[in-house]
Amino acid sequence: MTDWQNHALDKLDQIATSSATVFKAAKPFPHLVVDNFLSTEIAGALLNEFPADFDPIWQISDQKEIQIKLRSNWQSETNIRPATQSVVHFLNSGAVMKCFSKLTGIEKLISDPYYTGGGLNCTKRNGLLDVHADGNWHDAMGVHRRLNVILYLNKIWDPSWGGALELWDEKLTKCVTSIDPLFNRLIIFETHDLTYHGHPTPLMCPPDQSRKSLILYYYTASPRPKNQILVERPHRALWRKRQMRELA
């Protein structure tokens, strides 16, 4: 391992040992925020190679009131730039996943070599992500999605722009916790049918700025606990606004 990897792994191991109780007790569902996760150099390298808006790597998600953003369409590891690839490999390593298991209590985590739904995300001015619970299943691997990890890459950020990650209660009545997407901030949280999250208010950053992140998902072969299941079958995201329309 390189120096930055050793440093980040030591930090994760210490956090997993000291903060498991904090993670599990967090409201509205288990989560943890880790600031200054990577070395300044490697976090800066990630930002420096972040694709431009017009890069062909981007897949456009433009669903009014649901999600308006850019998402990387990684077909293979050859599409991933060097610093990003090194961080992705590190976060998907056995040593890191053992730390995540120690922190969360979710054993035998599996990374996603297909990067389904994960990778780089970029939200421009007026972009949004409606409050939702994530899809629960990986079709290609036949495994259950259990954990989300987000690393933010916003060197310049003003909270007045909006764009904070909102964690909502399971009845979808209110935002309980709001987390600003600050540079080199890592967020780890459980994902299941009741872990509603998003940034539903259109982003008001200047036209030359954006909300940047790296997102990875982790899975288990064994099913999630029954009390985390609303929909038994494999499903994609459960969007708040779509559910409200169905109930209207």
Q: PLM features: residue spans?
A:
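Fe(II)/2-oxoglutarate
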Residues: 1-27, 232-248
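A structural signal for short, well-ordered beta-strand segments and their strand-loop junctions
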Residues: 33, 59, 110-113, 119, ...
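Catalytic core of Fe(II)/2-oxoglutarate
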Residues: 137-145, 155-248
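Proline-centered turn/helix-capping motifs that create local helix->coil transitions or kinks
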Residues: 54-56, 107-110, 155-159
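Non-heme Fe(II) oxygenase catalytic core, chiefly the N-lobe of the double-stranded beta-helix
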Residues: 48-51, 79-82, 88-145
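Histidine-centered active-site/metal-ligand motif
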Residues: 31, 132, 197-199
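Non-heme Fe(II)/2-oxoglutarate
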Residues: 4, 11, 20-103
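Eukaryotic charged/polar low-complexity linker/IDR segments
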Residues: 148-150
